[in-house]
């Protein structure tokens, strides 16, 4: 996974990998090139990431992912 310089929190390779994989999966579903880049923008703190999260991840895990975003 590429390291996003906009992430200024904890550098946790595993967490960043999970967030990045969500963006990859989202891109694979929607096949829109901008999805992959926008999902990662602002260190995953953006509306595209939230849409991907809601579409791909069970609702009971949303808070966990949101906490990851705030960590990195």
Curated annotation (Swiss-Prot):
Coiled coil: none
Superkingdom, natural source: Eukaryota
Record-annotated disulphide pairs: 7-43, 23-39, 26-52
Single annotated GO MF: neuropeptide hormone activity
Subcellular localization(s) per the UniProt record: Secreted
A matching Pfam family: Crust_neurohorm
InterPro entries in alphabetical order: Crust_neurhormone_CS (IPR018251), Crust_neurohorm (IPR031098), Crust_neurohorm_sf (IPR035957), Hyperglycemic (IPR001166), Hyperglycemic1 (IPR000346)
Gene3D superfamilies in UniProt: Crustacean CHH/MIH/GIH neurohormone
Gene Ontology process terms (BP): circadian rhythm; glucose metabolic process; neuropeptide signaling pathway
In-chain residues carrying the UniProt-annotated modification Valine amide: 72
Gene Ontology cellular component list: extracellular region
Keyword list, A-Z: Amidation, Carbohydrate metabolism, Disulfide bond, Glucose metabolism, Hormone, Neuropeptide, Secreted
Function: Hormone found in the sinus gland of isopods and decapods which controls the blood sugar level. Has a secretagogue action over the amylase released from the midgut gland. May act as a stress hormone and may be involved in the control of molting and reproduction.
Family: Belongs to the arthropod CHH/MIH/GIH/VIH hormone family.
Name this polypeptide is given: Crustacean hyperglycemic hormone
Organism for this UniProt entry: Penaeus schmitti (White shrimp)
Highest classification ranks of the organism: Eukaryota, Metazoa, Ecdysozoa, Arthropoda, Crustacea
């Amino acid at each position: 996974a590429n390291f996003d310089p906009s992430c200024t929190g904890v550098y946790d390779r595993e967490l960043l990998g999970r967030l990045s994989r969500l963006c990859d999966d989202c891109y694979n579903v929607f096949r829109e090139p901008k999805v992959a880049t926008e999902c990662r923008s602002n260190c995953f703190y953006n509306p595209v990431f939230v849409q991907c999260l809601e579409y791909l991840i069970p609702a009971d895990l949303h808070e966990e992912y949101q906490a990851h975003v705030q960590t990195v």
